[in-house]
Amino acid sequence: MRYFEDIELGEVWDLGERPVDENEIMAFAAHYDPMPCHCDAVAAKESYFGSLTASSWHVNAMAMGLLTNIFKAQGLVSLGSPGINSVRWFVPVRPGDVLSGRSTVMAMRASNSRPMGIVTLRTEIFNQVRSKVAQMDGVGMYGRRPAKAGNNLS
């Protein structure tokens, strides 16, 4: 298990990569962001982007999937998130793109009221040519290392 105390300020996590599939783009859009540029390949050709593009919310969901895989791989004791401070999108994500990313620990502090630490992560997502497609500054809550039994001197 990896606790708040094991995280270091400035630490960078490689999030790995994932391909982006046309069917996945259209399925997500059909349910959550049914704009023609996301769910209709023919109409998308006439859009501002000139082709099918992933919804920005889909990009966020894919980024969260990459990040969550790292939490599991590292055994991080993640307790959820109170929110995202900022989200920016820079370049459209298209079918056939391969997304990769990194998260950097930007700030951290122990909670004054609960047995957890608060960590701000900057997550950057790139396409296969290393163009930044998105950036999120999010806040996460992480479990504190349990006190060892028998250490109570009172």
Indicate residue ranges for each PLM-predicted region.
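Hot-dog-fold acyl-thioester-processing enzymes
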Residues: 1-83, 145-154
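HotDog/MaoC-like acyl-thioester-processing domains
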Residues: 2-9, 91-154
